[in-house]
Amino acid sequence: MLPHPLAILSEEETNIARNVILAQHPNTVIDFREIYLSEPPKAQLLEFLALEHSGRLSPTSPRPPRLALCQYDVIGNDRIPSFEESVVDVGTRQRVQHRVVGKEHHASLTLSEFDTLVERCFASPLFQKALADFDLPEGFEVVIEPWPYGGLDYVEEKRRYFQGLCFATDKRKNNPDANFYSYPLPLIPVMDALTQEIIRVDRPATGGKGEGLTEQTFKRDIIGHCKDSDYVPELNPGGTRKDLKPLNVVQPEGPSFRITEESLVEWQKWRFRVAFNPREGATIHDVWYDGRSVLYRLSVSEMTVPYADPRPPFHRKQAFDFGDGGGGNMANNLSIGCDCLGVIKYFDAVMTGADGSAKKMPNAICLHEQDNGIGWKHSNWRTGRAVVTRHRELVVQFIITLANYEYIFAYKFDQSGGITVESRATGILNVVNIDAGKVSEYGNVVSGGVLAQNHQHIFCVRIDPAIDGPNNSVQVEESHPVPMNAVTNPNGNFYKVNTETMERAGFFDAAPELNRTVKMVNPHKKNPISQKPVGYKFIPLATQRLLADPNSIQARRAQFAQHHVWVTKYRDGELYAGGRYTLQSQEEIEGVSDAVKRGDSVVDTDVVVWSTFGITHNPRVEDWPVMPVEIFQLMIRPADFFTANPSLDVPSDKNISSRVVGNDCCRNAHI
């Protein structure tokens, strides 16, 4: 059976693409970075999907070719890598596109480059000399956490660098999971990726409020004032709680979802496909509800984490977690009963080794149902009857670990036609050393000698709507107060709802004082009851935008983070809010801001909506040593898409496994 055009590349297809690239470069060293599905041009795919949804698809129907995007370095005799991209038709085993990426761009990092950094640090006399300035207690060893270099300063030579954040770990605990972040060291070695040499060791300041940006105030006993702060249960001095009873998710008749072709999901009138790639992680495609098209594609496009400590080299501290290393590359192997509960379907991914060979990533995505409280309810006080349904959701989830931080991403589908994109931030704060007894305006002291720097986490979700078809418009709805008027508003209670259709690509920001709402509508189809165009809506999350000065490198390379909503006209391959190449970038290139600058018409056409939101994270002590989840939800809801509440037919069955607690659980309290 031929794979669906949206199915991820199989291991066999990945290896075919690899072999085609190797054949194109005989007697040359090829260092592979990524091989994954190059999604078909939208026009081709829509033709195929039309046949599929109409039931007219046959073995002889035209199909888009299976294309593999291959990213790799070609290393010649001069040992200087040339970053190149090719597209391979795995069906014909031919290379159909090829380009050499400009030297102004850097390929996303690989874990092998991080391994090299650690190895070279410990072998470097320069690093060992810097380390000799500190007296570490007996039993402590140095740990190096590799990090992207960040945005190059304008005066720096445009070479590829990596840096390491240094910590110490207490080996006397005999536990490899002991929290080394509790013991930060003020050393940051920098490696030239080409020569693989440590070219310098930056020495950040450790002072407090009122001290200079570069003042060296540390003592040789650099971690003598730091404290143990462990999070693994076996190292918790008080142990874990003993009064927590099990809470099980039980589905005795199995799940309500159905999976076919290892990518097609059907559940409660929803129909969509799940895919995965090394850049975005899990992506959602061809979303329909009850036989009607809703979305063409949904993904987490980018996120950036800029830090607010101006002391060098922290001014460069800014990660693009999807562009720099790839959200999919950093995905967890999800664990049953921990990461996901209930009756679970796992989806595997196929990734690429340094030699280009395919390797399976098991359990990259989990799919499960969950109860999220009441769906709808009404009590008729006249009859005493209450009708209530539960709000069940289908969750598509993946989790990524990026050094110290974890991010949990979930696409949630509900029975009333709603879609929620949820992100959760957890993990461990990125911390630096601070002198004993001092505080800082650049962050918060969360433990002895440990400063958690102020920073932001800014996400961008890409929404490609297909509201009853591919041609849509975007409306901005606002609710405005109206002054009292003796004729039109004599009592002052009236407010006016204004709706404007965007004419050109552009951007705007959340406005909670106006309840500013984004509506993605089909202008050719009206709701028979309201007479408004059918659509889906969301209210932009009113979170703080990027705080860095607009002229700073931080801001110039993350222009997508400067506004809450962007609206662009669709172009094939235009998927990444921060641009295709973010590693060491100095400005955003070919990102959403450039797409807006084209000034395309966005009326009754193929539009894309980008929603930016996040957290300004000024750390608190309670975030240490591991951070409770911070939750953000972008709620995409039907707006005059249906003729009534689409979940009216959800059964109001009573859950027979629920029971009342006995008197031994609930006793009278004495105050």
Curated annotation (Swiss-Prot):
User: Domain of life, per the record?
Assistant: Eukaryota
Pfam families on file? Cu_amine_oxid
Q: Which residues are glycosylated?
A: N471
Q: Which UniProt keywords are given for this protein, alphabetically ordered?
A: Copper, Disulfide bond, Glycoprotein, Manganese, Metal-binding, Oxidoreductase, TPQ
Signal peptide range: none
Cite the residue spans of the region called N3: 107-211
The entry's active site is: D321 (proton acceptor), Y405 (schiff-base intermediate with substrate)
Q: What protein name does the entry list?
A: Copper amine oxidase 1
Query: What organism does the UniProt record list as the source?
Result: Aspergillus niger
